[in-house]
Structure formats: structure tokens, C-alpha cells
């Protein structure tokens, strides 16, 4: 086919809906501003919390509740050393406490907090709460809820936690309508994808702060600090979002490339899920810009480009040179020039940091995702249907998560994202393969009907259905089991001893948490529903009163 003969009617257009935000984020007009006196108050509150945490060291349950509240309220990053010390103290007492106390709430809370911190404490502590083969003794609702939360830390082979998950979920669903607030809200959130382990930290904090306030026994200094800190970070995030929105608007990509998804706000929200803390501002900026590129690539390969054009673009990415520009169709020249410009900006940051080596890994990350997109385009062109194993090898690359994880390291501090960290991710260890499978399957499980509206390659659901001669419902159920298996593998890989420090591993864990939001019931990046809009508004528009 001559490139000049390619018409709009021959392109597999997806007709994505436009940006839902208009110019809402074009100007930074913070509803909350922190005065010098409030910054001083933050420091005073931090000192008060430190004192309280230290005083609680001799009271097991009190210390547990303090650590849990700090984490759930979203201020753990302010007390990393203190929490490390507190959890070491709790670990030393864990076995004896669980042996001497028949307290489901404290046992489950201890187990979850210690597992979250990487300590491989035994799940046998729950055996004494069993009631029959699959049942558990029902205690107060908070104890059952905490056991439900603890089950999200399970790994392969922990049958007691598999049984506890089913039991506690069913029990909480059965009594939810009879509960009153604030416990009703907490149960609702846990049952609807916002568990402590799998929820995005910023969403969790935003949801938990008002719940915590409703409990009469809340710690006043903690609550005040959590509100102040949330609003301060919200103002910072909105300022970052405004700068990125202006960058995106000035590029005029949705006008120049009208077939793409215009999702700058959703992209920023996605990447803030990787890291929300102030020290990761540069890393967020880089990741958002690269994910904007990846989104354009995805739409070009999936919903616009003719196969010969896509082959030219892949070759140009492989060669990575300005000399490739004239060989591309006009619309692809726009994309390729943007790639070079974004990477030139990244290079300038890396030179200042003395980490120029990271640029090679970032380029490699782009080549990986383009390779995945191209292989899928080739299958589509040849009307080839791969087997499940072959599909997953390619589709885990085209899910773009390996690319995003690699790029998430690029703007981090020098002593954290070492060459060894990049090489480790590229070697695809257990936690990476599990994360990539989770990303691919989560996407496929919610995107199948939309994809059927145009020429597409079969998804994991259809391939599994065909290979195993089962119904669509059975295939979906089995693939959901696969996503649970992936979470177990992620949990196991995060238990000590670990290969790399927490800041590296947290990027991978957080990348998985983002999937729980974007691929819950539908593909919320493609179809931005009201629930996602409300979440984004709570995080970037409305401060906590």
C-alpha cells in the first residue's frame, strides 16, 4: 500500500471521548494556602506525634493503633524512622502477644502491619480463630474487618488466609447494610477495592481522614497534622498539574493528533499513584511526560496507524536519530519530534544530577513498549491468533507497565535508582513478571467489549476461553484467580530479605495499586467515569475542611 493512498476510512479509529476537565487545571488557584504559622504548627504537631509514639512503646495495642493511624492518614513518610523503630519493637513482642492474647483484632492488625513492612510473620497465629473447616469465630465487626484487611497480605500456600478472605468478605457483605457510620463507611471502602494493601495511598488518606475524625477516640494531634499535610500536598500537586497541563496545552497534541485520548489529568493522577511525596517532584514530572508519549504510541498503533507506517515508526525508534524524521508520515513526524524533545529535557535533568546513564534505560523502556505494540499490530495485520502463552509474552510488554516502572526510577535520587536497580527490573524477576501479568489481565478483563467494536487482536479472555474450551464467564473467573495469584507473588517478593531498598520496591507495589483504580469495573483511562472524576476532584480541587 502506498502511504499516500491511506485514507481515514481505512484506519481503525476508536472515537475516544474528549477531555472531561476543559481548562479547569490551567490556572493554579489553590483553595488552601499555608501560612508561615501553619508550617510551624506542622512541626509542632510532628514533635507531639513523635512523643506519643515513643510513650506508646510499652503498650502493645496502643503502639499498634498509633502506627496504623499514621499510615492510614497518609503521613507515614513524615515518620519513617520512628515507624521502623516501632515495628521492630512490635515484631519482638509479636509471637508472645499472639500466644497470650485471644484478640482477633490485635492479632490481625499486628500481622498486617508487620507484613506490610516486609516481616514474614507466620499466618499460623490465625489458626486459633477458626471455627470448623472453613469458618471463623465471629467477634466484633472491627475485628472481622481487620482480619479481612490482613488477608490481603497472603502469599501462596497460606490456606488459612484464603479461607479467612472468603469468610470475612461474605460476613461483611451480609452485615454491611445493618451498620452505622463510621464503621459502615470503613467496611464499604474495604469491600469496594480500597483495602489498605491494594488502595492508592492518596485515595486511602482522603477517604480515611473523615472516617478517623468520626471515631470519638481519635488522636487530635494526628488528625490535625493529617489534614494540614493533605492540604499542603494537594496544593503542591495542583501546582505541578497546572504546569504539566500548560505544557500539554501548548503542544496542541489533541488538535494535531485528533485520534488520541486527551488524558493529561488522568495521567498525572496515575503517576502520582507511583509516588506522591514532595521529594519525587522531578520523578513525577518525567514519568507523566513519558506516559503521555506512551499513550500517543498506544493510540497510534491501536487506533490510527496503517501497518506500513507503524513499521517505519518502529524502525525510527530503534535507530533513535533526528535523521529519521523525514522518513516518517507527517503526523508521525509530530510524534517523533515530541519524543526527541522530551528526552532532550530528561537528558538535561540527568546531566545536572550526574545520572546520564539513566537515559539509556529510559530509551530502552520506550523500545520495549514500541516492540510490543508492533508485534500486536503485525498479528492484527496478518489476522493471526496467538496461543495464550505467546500472547502474554507480547501483551505484557504492550501493557506498558515495564516501561512505566523503569521510567519511574529515572528522576529518583542518585543513591536509590542505581544501574543495578534498572538491570534488575529488566531481568524481570518474580515481582516484575507478576506486576506485568496483573497489568495485562486487569486491562483485558474490563476492555473486551470496547475492543470488539473495531479490528483488534483477541484478548486474554477470548484466548483462554478458546484454548480451554470454557465459557466466557468461566474464563473471566479463572483470569481473576490469576490476578489474585499475581498479588500473592507481589506480596511474597516484598518480604525480607529483599533485593533492593523500599523506595525501589514501593514503585512496583504502587504501580500495582494504580491498576485497582483504573481497571476496577471498566477501563477508566479510556472511559473517564464519574467515580474517577470525583476521586480526582477530591485529590486536586477540594481541600479537607
Curated annotation (Swiss-Prot):
Entries under InterPro entries matching the protein: Isoprenoid_synthase_dom_sf (IPR008949), Terpene_cyclase-like_1_C (IPR034741), Terpene_cyclase_plant_C1 (IPR044814), Terpene_synth_N (IPR001906), Terpene_synth_N_sf (IPR036965), Terpene_synthase-like (IPR050148), Terpene_synthase_metal-bd (IPR005630), Terpenoid_cyclase/PrenylTrfase (IPR008930)
Superkingdom of the organism of origin: Eukaryota
Pfam families, A to Z: Terpene_synth, Terpene_synth_C
One GO process term, biological-process aspect: diterpenoid biosynthetic process
Pathway this chain belongs to: Secondary metabolite biosynthesis; terpenoid biosynthesis
Alphabetized CDD domains for the sequence: Terpene_cyclase_plant_C1 (cd00684)
Keywords: Cytoplasm, Lyase, Magnesium, Metal-binding
Keyword Lyase tagged: yes
Record's catalysed reaction(s): (2E,6E)-farnesyl diphosphate = (-)-germacrene D + diphosphate
Leading EC class: lyase
EC number: 4.2.3.75
Cofactor binding, per record: Binds 3 Mg(2+) ions per subunit.
Cofactor(s) annotated in UniProt: Mg(2+)
GO MF entries: germacrene-D synthase activity; magnesium ion binding; sesquiterpene synthase activity
Record's comment describing the protein's domains: The Asp-Asp-Xaa-Xaa-Asp/Glu (DDXXD/E) motif is important for the catalytic activity, presumably through binding to Mg(2+).
Record's protein name: Germacrene D synthase 1
Record organism: Pogostemon cablin
